[in-house]
Amino acid sequence: MELLSIIFFFLSTYGLGAAISFFVAESEEFLERNLMRFGIGLGLMLFLGFLLNLLKIPLDWRIFMILSLLVLISKFYLDYRKNRLFSLDLKLNMYAVLVIVLFAATSYMHVKGAFAYPYLEDDDSWSHSLGIKYVAVEKTAFAGPNSPFGYLDPYPPAYDMLFGIIHQTNNSLYWTMKFFNALIVSIPLIFFYFFAKIFTK
C-alpha cells in the first residue's frame, strides 16, 4: 500500500504539472523541465483540491489520478502528432544532478530520522493527524463551525488536505505523516535551485 501512495504522489504531481506545457514554454533542459513539473503539479494539486472542495466534489485520490493521467495522455498524443515525442538531446546540467544527489541525501536523513522513533513529533502532529484522517474518510476539507480540527477550515487546510488525499491510498496514518512530511521538507531544495538559477542569470 505504501508503494501505491508513492506512485500516486509522483504520478499525480507530475501529470498535473505537465499541464503547464499547454500554456507556457517549458525549459529546454531535460532535468529542469521534468523536475519542475513535480513542483508545479504539487501547487496545482492543492489548488485543484480547494476547487473540488468548493464545488462539493469529493476529494478522492482517484479523481486526481484520472485527471493526471488524462493530462499525460493528451500531452503524449499532441507530442506524437508533432513528431517531438522523444528527444535524444537530454542537456543534463551537472549542477542539477548535484542538487538531485543533495535531495536524495536530505530525504534519506529526514526519513531515517522520522522513523527512528515510533511517535509523532509534537502537539501539532497529533492535531494534524485528526484533520488528515477526517479528509481521508469524509473526502472534504470543510468540517463546519465548532469542529474539533485545528488545521481545517477556516485555517488554510492545504497540509491536512494533501496528506488526507494521500492517506486514502494506504492504511497507515503514521507512515503517511512520517514519510510524506520528510519528503515535502526535502523536495523544495530542487525547486529552489531552479528558482535561484533563473534569478541569478
Residue ranges and their predicted role:
Residues 22, 47-50, 98-102, 126, ...:
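Generic detector of bulky aromatic hydrophobic side chains
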Residues 8, 30-32, 47, 101, ...:
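Hydrophobic alpha-helical context, especially transmembrane and signal-peptide helices
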Residues 1-92:
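Membrane-embedded, hydrophobic transmembrane alpha-helices
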Residues 18-25, 99-106, 132:
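Membrane-targeting and insertion segments and their boundary/processing signals
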Residues 104-201:
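Active-site lumenal/periplasmic loops and adjacent helix-entry segments of GT-C-fold
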Residues 40-44, 67-70, 102-105, 125-130:
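Mid-membrane cores of alpha-helical transmembrane segments in multi-pass membrane proteins
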Residues 11, 35, 74-77, 100, ...:
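Generic intrinsically disordered, low-complexity segments enriched for polar/acidic and small residues
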Residues 89-110:
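Internal/C-terminal transmembrane anchor helices
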